[in-house]
A protein has these predicted regions:
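Pyridoxal 5′-phosphate
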Residues: 1-287
Length: 287
């Protein structure tokens, strides 16, 4: 899980006394569903919050099955779709999740904007989380009558330009087609994985059977930040660090990883440039 699907729940637990339980995962980066079912069977689970696609490993979690298992016990499910939304075709009705959230900047839109999908009955039952203008129908000094959905959750002046920018990004990606994007990225992932495995001392983190869009790795004796710096000088942009997923780093016993993420615009030539630059990293460290 990304920190954004951990820290808010920890804050909630501090306020309410609730207990946060975690489903463990295998060395390959796959959730252990038997442990998930065991937690559900405890009878104490109030909400399942799970990432659709791991931003640190690329694992695609079996969301549909997890939702069905939770619903069999009348447990609602919130899906963190920030990483999956630009890489997979998502149908929230088919998934039948109660909530699905994603951020604009992950789908080529402006920063500071996001989307929370929720089932209408649940949203109507929920109180506003903040107050301000435009989220009201009637205000007196004695009470406030809130506006209908979705306005009651949108206090104050919204990010008008950001929302328009997000709409343009969604239109652009929809015109290409997410199925086409997924196929392109899968081909790049397969190609890159095969090339990276040829580099001695390079260890790929996360080898789930169902995976998309990215490859995270370490190189023996070389800090990921050094990898990122050298690649930057070679004109190759990757991400190096804990990727806002420190529990995953702790699970693998590493401080950080280097991560190459693929998008709709990437090509095989760029994968070749990445691999060539990684060989140069090895040369510089004389490994």
């Amino acid at each position: 899980e990304h920190h954004s699907n951990i820290v808010p729940w920890q804050l909630l637990c501090e306020r309410t006394g609730a207990v946060l339980k975690v489903v463990p995962f295998t060395d390959a980066g796959e959730l252990i569903l038997e442990e998930y079912e065991r937690l559900l069977a405890s009878g104490r689970v109030k909400l399942v919050a799970v990432v659709h696609l791991s931003n640190a490993l690329g694992t695609i979690n079996p969301i549909k099955l997890m939702i069905e298992l939770a619903h069999a016990r009348n447990i609602p499910v919130l899906v963190d779709g920030a990483q999956s939304i630009p890489h997979l075709a998502v149908d929230v009705r088919a998934l039948d999740c109660e909530f699905y959230a994603f951020s604009s900047h992950k789908i080529y839109g402006p920063s500071g904007v996001g989307v929370l999908y929720g089932k209408k009955a649940l949203l109507e039952a929920m109180p506003p989380y903040q107050g301000g203008g435009d989220m009201i129908r009637l205000v007196t000094f004695e009470e406030t009558e809130y506006a209908d959905l979705p306005n009651k959750f949108e206090a104050g002046t919204p990010s008008i330009a950001g929302v328009i920018g997000l709409g343009a990004a969604l239109d652009w990606l929809s015109a290409i087609g997410l199925d086409a994007v997924a196929a392109q990225e899968h081909e790049l992932l397969e190609y890159a994985t095969a090339q990276l495995r040829e580099i001695p001392g390079l260890n790929i983190m996360g080898t789930a059977r169902d995976k998309a869009a990215l490859v995270a790795f370490t190189m023996q004796g070389i800090h990921p930040h050094d990898i990122g710096t050298i690649l930057d000088r070679e004109g190759v942009a990757i991400r190096a660090g804990h990727h806002c997923a420190q529990p995953i780093m702790q699970r693998y016993g590493v401080p950080a990883t280097a991560r190459a993420s693929f998008a709709a615009y990437n090509t095989r030539d760029e994968v070749d440039a990445l691999v060539k630059a990684l060989w140069k990293v090895k040369e510089l460290f004389e490994l």
